[in-house]
């Protein structure tokens, strides 16, 4: 197979998967030669800059369409080029004798990513530790690939989330399930969180309705994880010794009464733990606030009054706030998540979805998850009895744990969602 033919196939299959998920979906495409390093570990298909000419040829022959991007370095704005299938190509897609479920990620796709200070991926040499992490991720991704993960009551496999400029389309499909670990600042001790899977971008209200192979799910999270981790670094067991809502404040009177003070305090504290200076924390807070919300309009003085109250409330860890401590905490919660992924993949052979400090498992495995979350937290931090909250409630609670000696498929024998069956037709 010639290189050109291979590249055409890659482009058309990518467009087919996008079209199958959402007929209006475009794919980002870089026209920068430097974006294509054929020998990079992050380029599993070894795609070189030749692909730019291939795309230009497909556009000139009206097989695909393109919207050119731009980059205004003065204003700091821009977007990458987008490509999508032409009407002629969409007609061909409708006649295809295969479906999106027969298209899978390349087996050599790199799940361990190391980024530099500019958040760009960098090459690295494998070590025994990295190889072990990769093996875990590879086995975990195989399990996810074999699991049908869906939101049961969607008429179309699509969510519109966010508002204003942050409004985006989130495809709920069986292709966006690949999970990787990302380390930062060219340092294996910085970061290490698990990223990937459409569920990480899915609002909590929709996560409650996730099904795995036709089974309902349950989600459990660590309460105030990063706050608890900071206290544990000071030798304090937060829930055993303090046991207060870490985000509850009183006496803040200079803000819009429509603002939920607890929610604002939570967002500000978490951004301040990640930021290395106050101004960056305030900017990050407003950036993450919803468009048009009163939180979006909060001034630096208003945010400073909340942050000062949080520092007084959390005096033992006040020195860690706006110190850039978040990246080190990401290493710890990445280690906790790795332990949970390993035990569910290898011991229970049961899929688990990760959302940084919360986890989703098939309903009936939630008590196992609760126990394993406690075990993982204690193993990594040395702190016992962390509080974990059930964030999904069901009236039809199962009273009996699954029998782990039985084959996993026995527990996943419920019928898949009706939309899933329609997609397979």
Where are these regions (language model features)?
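Acidic, glycine-rich two-metal-ion catalytic cores of nucleic acid-processing enzymes
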Residues: 80-261, 358, 373
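Active-site palm subdomain of RNA-directed nucleic acid polymerases
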Residues: 335-355
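C-terminal polymerase-core module
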Residues: 276-281, 366-425
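Catalytic palm active-site di-aspartate
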Residues: 221-222, 350-362
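Helical catalytic core of nucleic-acid polymerases
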Residues: 3, 17, 23-48, 197-322
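Adenine-nucleotide phosphate-binding core of ATP-dependent small-molecule kinases
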Residues: 319-336
């Amino acid at each position: 197979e010639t290189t050109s033919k291979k590249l055409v196939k890659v482009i058309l299959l990518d467009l087919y998967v996008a079209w199958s998920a959402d007929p209006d979906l475009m794919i980002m495409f870089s026209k920068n030669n430097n974006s294509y390093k054929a020998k990079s570990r992050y380029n599993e298909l070894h795609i070189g800059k030749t692909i730019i000419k291939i795309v230009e040829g497909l556009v000139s022959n009206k097989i695909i369409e393109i919207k050119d991007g731009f980059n205004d370095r003065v204003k700091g704005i821009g977007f990458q080029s987008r490509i999508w299938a032409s009407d002629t190509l969409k007609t061909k897609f409708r006649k295809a004798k295969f479906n999106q479920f027969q298209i899978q990620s390349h087996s050599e796709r790199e799940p361990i990513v190391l980024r530099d200070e500019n958040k760009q991926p960098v090459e690295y040499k494998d070590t025994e530790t990295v190889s072990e992490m990769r093996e875990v991720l590879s086995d975990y991704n195989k399990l996810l690939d074999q699991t049908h993960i869906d939101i049961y009551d969607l008429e179309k496999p699509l969510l519109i989330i966010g508002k204003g400029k942050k409004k985006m389309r989130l495809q709920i499909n069986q292709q966006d399930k690949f999970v990787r670990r990302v380390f930062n600042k060219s340092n294996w001790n910085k970061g290490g969180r698990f990223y990937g899977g459409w569920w990480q971008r899915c609002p909590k209200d929709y996560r409650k309705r996730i099904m795995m192979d036709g089974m309902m799910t349950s989600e459990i999270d660590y309460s105030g994880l990063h706050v608890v981790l900071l206290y544990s670094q000071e030798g304090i067991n937060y829930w055993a010794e303090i046991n207060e809502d870490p985000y509850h404040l009183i006496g803040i009177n200079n803000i819009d009464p429509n603002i939920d003070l607890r929610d604002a305090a939570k967002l500000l504290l978490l951004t301040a733990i990640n930021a290395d200076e106050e101004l960056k924390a305030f900017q990050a807070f407003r950036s993450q606030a919803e468009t048009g919300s009163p939180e979006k309009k909060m001034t630096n003085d208003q945010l400073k009054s909340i942050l000062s109250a949080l520092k007084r409330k959390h005096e033992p860890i006040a020195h860690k706030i706006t110190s850039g401590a978040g990246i080190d905490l990401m290493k710890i919660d990445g280690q906790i998540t790795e332990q949970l992924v390993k035990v569910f993949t290898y011991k229970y052979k049961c899929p688990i979805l990760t959302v940084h400090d919360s986890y989703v498992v098939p309903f009936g495995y939630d008590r196992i998850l609760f126990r394993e979350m406690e075990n993982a937290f204690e193993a990594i931090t040395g702190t016992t009895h962390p509080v974990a909250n059930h964030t999904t409630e069901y009236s039809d609670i199962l009273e009996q744990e699954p029998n782990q000696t039985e084959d996993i498929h026995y527990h996943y024998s419920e019928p898949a969602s009706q939309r899933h069956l329609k997609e397979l037709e």
